[in-house]
A protein has these predicted regions:
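Conserved phosphate-donor/acceptor-positioning beta-strand/loop module used by diverse small-molecule
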Residues: 61-78, 106
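Short gly/ser/thr-rich secondary-structure transition/capping motifs
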Residues: 3, 45-52, 86-89
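Hydrophobic anchor at the beta1->P-loop junction of P-loop NTPases
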Residues: 20
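Small-molecule kinase domains that catalyze NTP-dependent phosphoryl transfer to phosphate-bearing small molecules
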Residues: 81-119, 130
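Conserved Walker
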Residues: 30
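Conserved glycine(s) of the Walker
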Residues: 27
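Conserved substrate/cofactor phosphate-moiety recognition/catalytic segment
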Residues: 10-12, 23, 33-63
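Pre-Walker A adenine-sensing motif
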Residues: 2-10
Length: 130
């Protein structure tokens, strides 16, 4: 099986740090795994669990902030979450500062894993001139 050499590159400290935020089951962990395979430095920022609105800035200080979003029904179907619409809305409220300051916002409801990764990589490359 042929592999894309780019996917196997180790993450370089010369590449920007990409912060990824969003509600539970929006695709953050999957995106981070894909970015890592392609040689990018990325980190999940658990802003959805914090009442400190700018925690994403204080702890991580990402060069690029990606906000992945998903609707309440989608999050429930992806992870079989047993949470209510108000629970989901509370996460949205906790994420409002990060969403307002995100460099890229993606609604992942209708996107495949590959589409999310491709859109983010295209965006990051346009920002860093890669």
């Amino acid at each position: 099986m042929a592999t894309n050499a780019q996917e196997d590159e180790p993450a370089s400290t010369t590449k920007p740090l990409i912060g990824v935020v969003g509600p539970c089951a929006a695709g953050k962990s999957t995106l981070i795994a894909g970015l890592t395979r392609r040689g990018y430095r990325s980190r999940h920022i658990a802003q959805e669990h914090s009442y400190v609105k700018d925690m994403w800035q204080r702890l991580t200080r990402p060069d690029i902030l990606i906000f992945l979003d998903a609707s309440h029904p989608t999050t429930c179907s992806r992870r079989k979450l047993d949470w209510t619409e108000p629970d989901w809305q509370e996460q949205q409220n906790r994420l409002s500062h990060a969403r307002a300051n995100a460099d890229l916002y993606l609604d992942t409801d209708k996107l495949s894993i590959e589409e999310v990764l491709d859109e983010v990589v295209t965006f990051v490359r346009s920002r860093i001139g890669d």
